[in-house]
């Protein structure tokens, strides 16, 4: 039984990978990527939390009387 000559296989594999990469790039060239809407046009909505709505007094620790 004759043995299979393996010398051309690395070249075949490399050319296949290169061809697939080239075809993929050509397919992506026709694809339109839409830009995400910029946030500069719309003002960011600030959510009000409950602790921002009311004023809280900060107490100091009890001091020693002299």
From Swiss-Prot:
UniProt entry keywords in alphabetical sequence: Acetylation, ATP synthesis, CF(0), Hydrogen ion transport, Ion transport, Membrane, Mitochondrion, Transmembrane, Transmembrane helix, Transport
Membrane topology: Single-pass membrane protein
GO cellular component terms, A-Z: mitochondrial membrane; proton-transporting ATP synthase complex
Post-translational modification N6-acetyllysine, affected residues: 54, 57
Record GO biological process: proton motive force-driven ATP synthesis
Major localisation: mitochondrion
PTM-bearing positions, type N6-succinyllysine: 54
Spans through the membrane: 8-24
Superkingdom of the organism of origin: Eukaryota
Molecular function via GO: proton transmembrane transporter activity
Keyword Ion transport appears in the UniProt entry: yes
Assembly and interaction partners: F-type ATPases have 2 components, CF(1) - the catalytic core - and CF(0) - the membrane proton channel. Component of an ATP synthase complex composed of ATP5PB, ATP5MC1, ATP5F1E, ATP5PD, ATP5ME, ATP5PF, ATP5MF, MT-ATP6, MT-ATP8, ATP5F1A, ATP5F1B, ATP5F1D, ATP5F1C, ATP5PO, ATP5MG, ATP5MK and ATP5MJ. Interacts with PRICKLE3.
Family per record: Belongs to the ATPase protein 8 family.
Listed name of the protein: ATP synthase protein 8
